[in-house]
A protein has these predicted regions:
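Residues forming the flavin
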Residues: 1-339
């Protein structure tokens, strides 16, 4: 008899883990709260560093889960720990007795309207990174011939007042990627990036930063934006301080893009509350061991993959999903031997 594995969350981590568990011979039940699989990847256009299509990447991931029991628009209604299994009642009325559970609930984006000084939801010209990516994906750009566009890094990240002092890890690279892409669409526009510190830490990240400056002429201003105001002509005046020169600056823009950071998924936290999963100070879930067992929760048979334990890049998420599948396989086999 095949062991049942419940995977909660149908983003990249859930898809990759489900595919690996299916190949190992397990009966995988994958649930996703949205109407479509893919999580945030389903809303993206091109991916860093190679500019590959997010659509094609998602298609490759979903092709691998053929044969997996997959339920969209479904959430965990109740979850209980039994002896060495989990009893889950799903919102579609199905009950699952799972030998192991993988939580891959991903992340939520910070609600940019909470930073009122930036004017999101107030001024038409202020959008988020997700809004811009949607425009790229749908090929419906919001402006005709803009003269200047700005990007604000760390919106809702590294911000005590916003309740998140931690770095969201991917925002700097995403901002630089999108700044380059916006120059491809509007080559005559001036593009500015307002940043605290540029954290271009991964392979090819520094190359992208240099390319942004040398090939696209993007201006990087180290400093916090303090105020955004709409002018009579509908353009935006941005006040900031250039911390390298210690001088206040004002820039007039046609559009301002806010790089909204990652926050813990509320859907994931709802699951966690049902079985008292522990979280870190930032709200993301705690692993059994942050070095040796990051995919394991502190409960037997309950595992994590992806951004539910903290901000991650897509490659890191996929690597972690494969690792989580192996950890689940080892756990099941060890339990089988004990019986």
């Amino acid at each position: 008899m095949k062991n049942n594995i419940l995977v909660i969350g149908g983003g990249p981590a859930g898809l990759e883990a489900s595919a690996n568990l299916k190949r190992m011979g397990y009966n995988v039940i994958l649930i996703e709260k949205e109407s479509k699989l893919g999580g945030h990847l389903a809303k993206w256009d091109r991916l860093f560093p190679d500019g590959v299509s997010a659509r094609k990447t998602l298609e490759a991931l979903t092709d691998e889960i053929r044969g997996v029991n997959c339920f969209t628009e479904t959430q965990v209604q109740s979850l209980n720990i039994l002896d060495k299994s989990y009893n889950a009642i799903l919102s579609n009325g199905i009950t699952v007795l799972a030998d192991a559970v993988l939580l891959s609930s991903g992340f939520d984006l910070f609600k940019a309207e909470k930073k009122e000084e930036y004017g999101y939801g107030i001024y038409e010209g202020v959008i988020t990174n997700a809004d811009l990516e949607k425009a790229f994906r749908e090929k419906k750009m919001p402006l005709n011939e803009p003269r200047a566009i700005g990007f604000v890094h760390c919106v809702g990240s590294r911000d005590e007042k916003a309740g998140n002092p931690a770095c969201s890890k991917v925002c700097c690279a995403t901002a630089v990627k999108q700044a380059c892409e916006i120059k491809e669409v509007y080559p005559n526009a001036d593009v500015y990036c307002f940043y605290m510190d540029l954290r271009m830490f991964g392979r090819h990240y520094e190359d992208l930063y240099l390319k942004a400056q040398k090939e696209f002429g993007i201006r990087f201003i180290r400093g916090r934006v303090s105020e955004v105001a709409e002018m009579a002509d509908g353009r935006l005046q941005v006040k900031a301080e250039d911390t390298l020169s210690s001088k206040p600056i004002r820039v007039t823009l046609d559009m301002l893009v806010l790089m909204a950071g990652m926050r813990p998924s509320e859907a994931g936290r709802s699951v966690g509350r049902q079985i008292n999963l522990t979280t870190e100070d930032d709200g993301f879930f705690s692993s059994e061991d942050n070095l040796l067992a990051i995919q394991k929760s502190k409960l037997p048979g309950f595992f994590y993959a992806g951004a539910c334990t903290g901000p991650k890049t897509l490659p890191d998420t996929l690597h972690e999903a494969r690792s989580a599948a192996l950890e689940i396989d080892r756990y099941i086999k060890e339990n089988t031997r004990e019986k």
